[in-house]
């Protein structure tokens, strides 16, 4: 009888806690890493995989996905989790809320969330979890039960939803939000969400550090005003969308969110998809102003790889794709260690859904697109060019998100951890084509981009 279920031999193991990349074999038993050592006897394993000297990264943890936003959740869970695995992602955490899109219904999570779980159960090709957004007053009262009964540890606020639409200006956000009559989704609601989550943390000290709040930081009033100005002017495409949602809208929202966290004594705050120099600057200023708050800062791979001149309207997303100077600013902060994790913000939006009747009108297009299938390959490719080390990449894509979101057996390649492994050929040159993707989205905002690293093999708990 063999000691191990799987032996992945001849790989260069990348770990987040050491600068050394080790030439070792990885032995797996019962879905966990059982031994790391050079020259493990192949006779000890039931199955042997030759890694061919490739880099072995801990499986990426893509903590920002949107399964089911534009397509049925049961369908997206299958196709988009396959795309995730294609990108070296072994764990996806996807956002879910009530209101327009997703299940397209309001109500309490006690009724809605079991339906979400049933629709996704048994369909994913990767491990997964859900962040939940308290959209109405009753959801705040449910935070404790969502933690205790369903294991939810992460909650979200969309700061602009109360007064500005998902795709642009909106005259009736209440209908979109599907909240009870008389309720408002505003700063007061955000404060009460924070107080509700902090109460849950205080009542559960053993897991308090795993309970956090993520925020999409843009300011509705600024965006509505600027959208009217831009719509009346000559700008078109991604430049117009960028100008309609200016970077200082992010900075102001970050400032407000941070002070509310200070006021409510909620110390676990995640600032999502920061897209501009001003957003990162505001986030760092707030971290200095409120050192007792454990801020985590996120950027997306698309904001690191595209700008308003390299992509078309298919790249409409919130916050917007920015000019090249903002892209360079994001990279400066990534290299300086100011960013905690890199994600995809994957939201599969097929061509027939994405564009309006006038395909050239960015304000008629829907927001969001896919890209999880390129997460690790693209970050290794572009990161190596800019001096990002492999251990830094492992921290940005696996270790840091695992620690924040309480995934205690994930995040590194070490004995006792889940055997979630992504093999990367760091010298494979290839070109992005949407037709090669496992996603059901028919286009890619990275179409034609040449990458110099590629995920070749992925193991989820040793399979």
Residue ranges and their predicted role:
Residues 141-157, 161-342, 347:
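Histidine/acidic residue-rich metal-binding segments in metalloenzymes
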Residues 51-123:
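Metal-associated gating/positioning segment near the N- to mid-region
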Residues 11, 26, 31, 53, ...:
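Divalent metal-coordination and catalytic microenvironments
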Residues 1-57:
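Histidine-rich, glycine-flanked metal-binding segment
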Residues 74-81, 137-146, 256:
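Short, acidic/polar
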Residues 94, 129-132, 268-273:
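Short catalytic-loop micro-motif centered on adjacent basic/acidic residues
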Residues 356-361, 415-463:
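C-terminal cap of metal-dependent C-N hydrolases
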Residues 235-266, 336, 341-342, 348-422, ...:
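His/Asp/Glu-enriched, well-ordered alpha-helical/loop segment
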């Amino acid at each position: 009888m063999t000691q191990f279920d799987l032996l992945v031999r001849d790989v260069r193991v990348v770990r987040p806690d050491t600068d050394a990349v080790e030439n070792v074999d990885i032995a797996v038993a019962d879905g966990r890493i059982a031994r790391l050592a050079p020259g493990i006897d192949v006779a000890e394993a039931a199955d042997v995989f030759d890694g061919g000297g490739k880099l072995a990264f801990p499986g990426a943890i893509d903590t920002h996905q949107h399964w089911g936003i534009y397509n049925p959740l049961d369908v997206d869970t299958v196709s988009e989790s396959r795309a995730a695995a294609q990108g070296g992602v072994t764990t996806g955490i996807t956002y879910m809320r009530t209101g327009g899109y997703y299940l397209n219904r309001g109500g309490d999570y006690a009724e809605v969330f079991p339906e979400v779980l049933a629709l996704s159960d048994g369909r994913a090709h990767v491990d997964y979890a859900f962040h939940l957004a308290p959209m109405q007053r009753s959801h705040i009262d449910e935070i404790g039960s969502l933690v205790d009964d369903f294991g939810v540890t992460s909650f979200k606020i969309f700061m602009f939803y109360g007064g500005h639409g998902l795709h642009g200006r909106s005259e009736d956000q209440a209908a979109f939000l599907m909240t009870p009559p008389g309720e408002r989704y505003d700063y007061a609601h955000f404060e009460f969400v924070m107080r509700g989550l902090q109460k849950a943390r205080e009542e559960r000290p053993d897991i308090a550090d795993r309970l956090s709040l993520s925020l999409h930081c843009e300011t509705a009033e600024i965006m509505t005003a600027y959208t009217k100005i831009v719509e009346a002017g000559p700008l078109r495409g991604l430049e117009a969308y960028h100008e309609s949602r200016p970077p200082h809208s992010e900075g102001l929202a970050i400032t407000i969110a941070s002070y509310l966290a200070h006021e409510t004594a909620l110390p676990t705050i995640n600032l999502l998809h920061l897209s501009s120099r001003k957003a990162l600057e505001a986030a760092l200023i707030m971290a200095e102003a409120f050192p007792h708050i454990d801020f985590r800062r996120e950027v997306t791979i698309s904001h690191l790889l595209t700008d308003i001149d390299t992509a078309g309207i298919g790249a409409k997303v919130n916050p917007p794709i920015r000019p090249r100077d903002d892209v360079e600013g994001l990279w400066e902060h990534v290299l300086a260690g100011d960013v905690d994790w890199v994600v995809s913000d994957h939201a599969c939006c097929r061509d027939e859904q994405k564009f309006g009747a006038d395909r050239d009108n960015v304000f008629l297009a829907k927001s969001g697109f896919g890209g999880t299938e390129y997460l690790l390959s693209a970050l290794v490719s572009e990161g190596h060019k800019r001096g990002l080390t492999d251990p830094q990449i492992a921290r940005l894509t696996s270790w840091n998100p695992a620690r924040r979101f309480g995934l205690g057996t994930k995040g590194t390649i070490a004995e006792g951890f889940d055997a979630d492994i992504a093999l990367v050929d760091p010298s494979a040159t290839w070109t992005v084509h949407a037709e090669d993707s496992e996603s059901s989205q028919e286009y890619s905002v990275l179409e034609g981009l040449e990458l110099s690293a590629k995920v070749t093999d992925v193991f989820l708990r040793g399979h």
